[in-house]
């Protein structure tokens, strides 16, 4: 069986990354979103194993000590991370795995899994991004300014990625994301094992 491929997708907050990834994976049994571990409290409506794997701080730090994570970060008082086994189990079935992480996490993943494919999603304009942040949050001007600063910092790392998509028209951006996945599945490296019998017959 051909091993699946890991996709790393990053974007500033408000660029529509989560909506695009959800739409990409909807009805696609050969694609799976990797579920992260976190120490933050479970919120109403969240399902363990679907939204996050919820663990306490001691368990998370034990996993860090055991080098169990592809990537992890501490955000304010909580840890977030992607376990190696979570991704490896998906890839071993031949399915592709999708990680939604920031540029720092993406950099960690590339060091451990250099064959991963990375995509950065940009908003159509700075004004559109600010408007999306205002629409999503009932925050003060100071908080919105900090969010914009964080978004600009995230976007400054776009050149570290393999592909760039601008999410202006959602359906167009989704089709571009699908095209990236389809293109990767048609490489000789991935097609040759699947087409082994055909190739042997054609060349025999």
From Swiss-Prot:
Q: What is its main location?
A: cytoplasm
Q: What is this protein called?
A: Guanylate kinase
**Location in the cell:** Cytoplasm
Its annotated function is as follows: Essential for recycling GMP and indirectly, cGMP.
Q: Which reaction does it catalyse?
A: GMP + ATP = GDP + ADP
Got any disulfides in this one, which pairs? none
The text of the family note is: Belongs to the guanylate kinase family.
Q: Where does ATP bind?
A: 11-18
Q: Which HAMAP family match?
A: Guanylate_kinase
Report keywords, A-Z: ATP-binding, Cytoplasm, Kinase, Nucleotide-binding, Transferase
Task: Write down the Pfam families for this protein, in alphabetical order.
Answer: Guanylate_kin
Q: Which GO terms describe its cellular component?
A: cytosol
Q: Which InterPro entries match?
A: GK/Ca_channel_bsu, Guanylate_kin-like_dom, Guanylate_kinase, Guanylate_kinase_CS, P-loop_NTPase
Extract the GO molecular function terms from the UniProt entry.
ATP binding; guanylate kinase activity
Whose protein is this, by species?
Answer: Methylococcus capsulatus (strain ATCC 33009 / NCIMB 11132 / Bath)
- Which CDD domains is this protein grouped with? GMPK
């Amino acid at each position: 069986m051909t091993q699946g491929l890991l996709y790393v997708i990053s974007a500033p907050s408000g660029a529509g990354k989560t909506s695009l990834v959800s739409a990409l994976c909807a009805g696609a049994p050969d694609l799976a979103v990797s579920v992260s571990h976190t120490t933050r409290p479970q919120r109403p409506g969240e399902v363990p194993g679907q939204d996050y794997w919820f663990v306490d701080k001691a368990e998370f730090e034990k996993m860090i000590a055991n080098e169990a994570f592809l990537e992890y970060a501490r955000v304010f008082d909580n840890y977030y991370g992607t376990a190696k086994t979570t991704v490896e189990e998906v890839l071993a079935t031949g399915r592709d795995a999708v990680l939604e992480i920031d540029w720092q996490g993406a950099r960690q993943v590339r060091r451990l899994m250099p064959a991963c494919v990375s995509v950065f999603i940009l908003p159509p304009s700075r004004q559109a991004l600010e408007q999306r942040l205002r629409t999503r949050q009932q925050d003060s001007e100071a908080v919105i300014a900090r969010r914009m600063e964080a978004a600009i910092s995230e976007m400054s790392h776009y050149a570290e990625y393999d592909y760039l998509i601008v999410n202006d028209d959602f359906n167009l951006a989704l089709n571009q994301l699908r095209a990236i996945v389809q293109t990767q599945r048609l490489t000789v490296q991935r097609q040759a094992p699947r087409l082994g019998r055909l190739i042997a017959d054609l060349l025999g």
